[in-house]
């Protein structure tokens, strides 16, 4: 489960990450990554580690399918954030904001496929 301090909650912040952040995609999802520079315009949520949020629209499937995809993606993000906390060279910085947007292909994807897609997109974004 994604820890509360790592959740992205504000709709305004979701919009900012999607608009200002860099993005990379795969067949199953699109990852938006935004790492703001500290300063007067920076969001207040810059402490407590990276924050992540999900966008799973009706295009993915009915409510049961959307919730299943959300659970899988939340678990993937929690794993990545936990591993980054102990890694020598983490993919996500302390001030990073990540939004993962699920595409219709994610409904048929396994957890391993989703995890590899998220990791691949994040590695391409953090270059």
UniProtKB/Swiss-Prot annotation:
InterPro entries: Ribosomal_Su5_D2-typ_SF (IPR020568), Ribsml_uS5_D2-typ_fold_subgr (IPR014721), RNase_P (IPR000100). It holds the Pfam family Ribonuclease_P. It catalyses: Endonucleolytic cleavage of RNA, removing 5'-extranucleotides from tRNA precursor. GO terms for biological process: tRNA 5'-leader removal. One of its GO terms (cellular component) is ribonuclease P complex. Its EC number is 3.1.26.5. One of its GO terms (molecular function) is 3'-tRNA processing endoribonuclease activity. The keyword Ion transport does not apply. Keywords: Endonuclease, Hydrolase, Nuclease, RNA-binding, tRNA processing. It comes from the Bacteria. Belongs to the RnpA family. RNaseP catalyzes the removal of the 5'-leader sequence from pre-tRNA to produce the mature 5'-terminus. It can also cleave other RNA substrates such as 4.5S RNA. The protein component plays an auxiliary but essential role in vivo by binding to the 5'-leader sequence and broadening the substrate specificity of the ribozyme. Consists of a catalytic RNA component (M1 or rnpB) and a protein subunit. This is Ribonuclease P protein component. It comes from Corynebacterium urealyticum (strain ATCC 43042 / DSM 7109).
């Amino acid at each position: 489960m994604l820890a509360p301090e790592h959740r992205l909650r504000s709709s305004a912040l979701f919009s900012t990450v999607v608009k200002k952040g860099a993005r990379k995609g795969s067949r199953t999802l699109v990852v938006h990554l935004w790492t703001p520079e500290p300063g007067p315009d920076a969001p207040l949520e810059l402490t407590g580690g990276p924050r992540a949020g999900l966008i799973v629209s009706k295009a993915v499937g009915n409510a049961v399918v959307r919730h299943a995809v959300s659970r899988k993606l939340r678990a993937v993000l929690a794993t990545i954030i936990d591993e980054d906390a102990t890694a020598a060279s983490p993919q996500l910085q302390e001030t990073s904001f990540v939004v993962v947007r699920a595409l219709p292909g994610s409904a048929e994807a396994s957890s391993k496929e989703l995890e590899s897609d998220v990791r691949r997109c994040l590695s391409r974004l953090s270059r």
